[in-house]
């Protein structure tokens, strides 16, 4: 299980990302349109003024049971080994083990 502080940090990042979503979205659209170099520097300065943790690239998907940041299956929101255990004891309806 992941440390509680890491899970709390990830939740804080998620809240910041949601709070600054629209504020961050507008300047990035303006940057993609193109324009003069001075305008793009000005827009870049506005983006740099925002908190680092408000960037969506700093978020990680985590297993909602264990908090594990790696080997997540997006469809279930679980890490791979927890998903496998739950399928073995039939806690996930419709999921079957593969056999060939």
Curated annotation (Swiss-Prot):
Protein species of origin: Pisum sativum
HAMAP family cross-referenced by the UniProt entry: Ribosomal_uS14_1 (MF_00537)
Subcellular location: Plastid, Chloroplast
Keyword Ribosomal protein: yes
Protein's UniProt keywords contain Metal-binding: no
GO molecular function, a single term: rRNA binding
Xref: InterPro entries: Ribosomal_uS14, Ribosomal_uS14_bac/plastid, Ribosomal_uS14_CS
Name by which UniProt lists this protein: Small ribosomal subunit protein uS14c
Family in the record: Belongs to the universal ribosomal protein uS14 family.
Pfam families per the UniProt record, alphabetical: Ribosomal_S14
GO cellular component annotations of the record: chloroplast; small ribosomal subunit
Keywords attached to this entry: Chloroplast, Plastid, Ribonucleoprotein, Ribosomal protein, RNA-binding, rRNA-binding
GO biological process entries: translation
Disulphide linkage map: none
Assembly information from the UniProt record: Part of the 30S ribosomal subunit.
Purpose: Binds 16S rRNA, required for the assembly of 30S particles.
């Amino acid at each position: 299980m992941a440390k509680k502080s890491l899970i709390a940090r990830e939740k804080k990042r998620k809240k910041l990302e949601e709070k600054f979503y629209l504020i961050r979205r507008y300047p990035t659209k303006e940057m993609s349109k193109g324009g003069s170099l001075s305008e793009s520097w000005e827009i870049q300065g506005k983006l740099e003024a925002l908190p680092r943790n408000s960037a969506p690239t700093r978020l990680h998907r985590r297993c909602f049971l264990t908090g594990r940041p790696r080997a997540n299956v997006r469809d279930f929101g679980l890490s791979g080994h927890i998903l496998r255990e739950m399928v073995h004891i039939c806690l996930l309806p419709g999921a079957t083990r593969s056999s060939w």
